[in-house]
Amino acid sequence: MKIPKERRTYCPNCRKHTVHEVLESKRRKASELKWGQRQFRRVTAGYRGYPRPLPSGNKPVKKLDLRLKCKECGKSHIKKKSFRAGRVEYVA
């Protein structure tokens, strides 16, 4: 998949549309303290089994997190929607 190296998008720090540099970052492990994970631990505690059908098979590729770094202020933020991509190529 081809992704442009720079894009003009909204910067929450500057509060306006500016040119951003597109960087790739690895997805971090999901937080164990989120409500869903706490609920899951509560449901599976004790002698109870798994509450839903077991997920079968592995996903073919990992999800990609794009980090956008503002050229004006230098702050970076993550693009909200992440997606799966096998090969990523950054195009000028």
From Swiss-Prot:
Q: Which keywords appear in this protein's UniProt record, sorted alphabetically? A: Metal-binding, Ribonucleoprotein, Ribosomal protein, RNA-binding, rRNA-binding, Zinc, Zinc-finger
What does the entry list under GO cellular component?
ribonucleoprotein complex; ribosome
Q: Name one GO molecular function term.
A: zinc ion binding
Q: How is the cofactor bound?
A: Binds 1 zinc ion per subunit.
Q: Sorted alphabetically, which PROSITE patterns does this protein's record hold?
A: RIBOSOMAL_L44E (PS01172)
GO biological process, alphabetically ordered: translation
**Listed cofactors:** Zn(2+)
Which residues are noted in the entry as Zn(2+)-binding? C11, C14, C70, C73
Pfam families named among the record's database cross-references = Ribosomal_L44 (PF00935)
Taxonomic superkingdom: Archaea
| Chain ranges of zinc fingers (C4-type) | 11-73
**Family statement drawn from the similarity comment of this UniProt entry:** Belongs to the eukaryotic ribosomal protein eL42 family.
Q: Partners and quaternary state?
A: Part of the 50S ribosomal subunit.
What does this protein do, in the record's words? Answer: Binds to the 23S rRNA.
Its name, as the record gives it, is Large ribosomal subunit protein eL42
Q: Which organism is it from?
A: Methanothermobacter thermautotrophicus (strain ATCC 29096 / DSM 1053 / JCM 10044 / NBRC 100330 / Delta H)
Q: Which gene encodes it?
A: rpl44e
